[in-house]
Amino acid sequence: MSTIGIRRNPTVEAPGIDHMVGFESLDDVLQYADVIAMCVPSTPSTHHLLNAERIAKLKTDAIVINAGRGDAIDTQALADALANGMIRGAGLDVTEPEPLPVASPLWSEPKCLITPHVAGGNHLESTERRIIAIALGNVRCYANGQSLDNRMPLKG
C-alpha cells in the first residue's frame, strides 16, 4: 500500500506520504485511490473539489472521508454515487450545508457514516479518549452490520 498526498506545493514533503503531487495531478491519481481523505480549507479553488466528474473516476471500492470543509464535496453527487454503488462508502465529519438537512438522503444511506464536526477539535485528554472509543466502536459496529451507538433518530 502506498500513500499519495496532494497539495499546492508538492515539493514539500509530509510524514507518511510516499508520493506527493500537486492539485493539477488530482484527476490523474483518483483512479488509484482506495481512500480519499479530504482535509482541505474552504476556498474558491476547493469548492466541490470532489464533484460528480471526479467521483466517476474513483474505483467502486473507494471510500471518501471529509474532515476538512463540507463544501469540498458536491453533496448531491456523493449521495447519488453512494445510492448507485459507484463507491463503497463515505465518512463525513463536515457537510454542505451544515447542518445537513433532515431530508438529506445521506442520513439514511447505509454506506455513509456522519459525525458531528468533531475531527481536529481540541479536547481534554479524557474527552479525546471517549471520542476515540465511541468512534472505534461505531466503526466496528458499522463494519459488522450492527446498530451504531449514539445514533439519532431522524424524523422528516
Where are the regions that the model predicts?
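The conserved SAM/SAH-binding core of class I Rossmann-like methyltransferase domains
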Residues: 6
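Rossmann-like dinucleotide-binding domain for NAD(H)/NADP(H)
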Residues: 61, 67-156
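Residues at the starts of beta-strands that form the adenosine-phosphate
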Residues: 1-2
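Rossmann-like adenosine-cofactor binding region
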Residues: 9-105
